UniProtKB/Swiss-Prot annotation:
Domain of life: Bacteria
Keywords: Acyltransferase, Antibiotic resistance, Plasmid, Transferase
PANTHER family, per database record: CHLORAMPHENICOL ACETYLTRANSFERASE, SLR0299 PROTEIN
Organism: Escherichia coli
Phylogenetic lineage: Bacteria, Pseudomonadati, Pseudomonadota, Gammaproteobacteria, Enterobacterales
Stored NCBIfam families: chloram_CatA
GO molecular function, one term: chloramphenicol O-acetyltransferase activity
Family the UniProt entry places it in: Belongs to the chloramphenicol acetyltransferase family.
Gene for this chain: cmlA
Pfam families associated with the record: CAT
Protein name: Chloramphenicol acetyltransferase 2
Transmembrane parts of this sequence: none
Additional free-text comment from the UniProt record: Type II chloramphenicol acetyltransferases are sensitive to inhibition by thiol-reactive reagents. The inactivation occurs as a result of chemical modification of Cys-26.
Keyword Acyltransferase: yes
Length: 213
């Protein structure tokens, strides 16, 4: 996968990167509630399932912002030209999950075809990583459809330079005539600030509002 190198000598976040990578090693998690009322209406018109559609929308938003596509490669900070989703699928019979990956395509129908092909091939494979090694240029998506939450955090230890974002969805919430989806966004502070997380969330909300436009 192609990528762009970041020149740390001229990068406007070089001080922030050094601080949160070397001195105050930290990430942060931000949980919000997306209004998916319009999106659920669109689902009825398209015939698509909710989970893969959200995987598509999150991947689409990620691929608009370099902050969510960063990694260390050969000890250099880079951002991928494109990031592809790694998503979890649940196995009821074993009460375990697998992590699968499919390629991101800007075209929704093309993405859905790829997603459906991957899930059909591995739907009965209960290994954690049925496809083997995950792509380097990945983002992480999972869902907890059994429970709603107002906050969610993963405590990642032992890999201070893991910059791929983690997105976790929860059970819908009904508030009046609106349907809300709790979504947690977890990032490494070395490459992403609150501003970037907020911009991502606002972009994702616009995509949910205008999926058919």
């Amino acid at each position: 996968m192609n990528f762009t190198r970041i020149d740390l000598n001229t990068w406007n976040r070089r001080e922030h990167f050094a601080l949160y990578r070397q001195q105050i090693k930290c990430g942060f998690s931000l949980t919000t509630k997306l209004d998916i009322t319009a999106l659920r209406t669109a689902l009825a018109e398209t015939g698509y399932k909710f989970y893969p559609l959200m995987i598509y929308l999150i991947s689409r938003a990620v691929n608009q912002f370099p902050e969510f596509r960063m990694a260390l490669k050969d000890n250099e900070l880079i951002y991928w030209d494109q990031s592809d989703p790694v998503f979890t699928v649940f196995h009821k019979e074993t009460e375990t999950f697998s992590a699968l990956s499919c390629r991101y395509f800007p075209d929704l129908s093309e993405f859905m075809a790829g997603y459906n092909a991957v899930t059909a091939e591995y739907q009965h494979d209960t290994r954690l990583f049925p496809q083997g090694n995950l792509p380097e240029n990945h983002l992480n998506i999972s869902s907890l459809p059994w429970v709603s939450f107002d906050g969610f955090n993963l405590n990642i230890t032992g890999n201070d330079d893991y910059f791929a974002p983690v997105f976790t969805m929860a059970k819908f919430q009904q508030e009046g005539d609106r349907v809300l989806l709790p979504v947690s966004v977890q990032v490494h502070h070395a490459v992403c600030d609150g501003f970037h997380a907020a911009r991502f969330i606002n972009t994702l909300q616009l995509m949910c509002d205008n999926i058919l436009k």
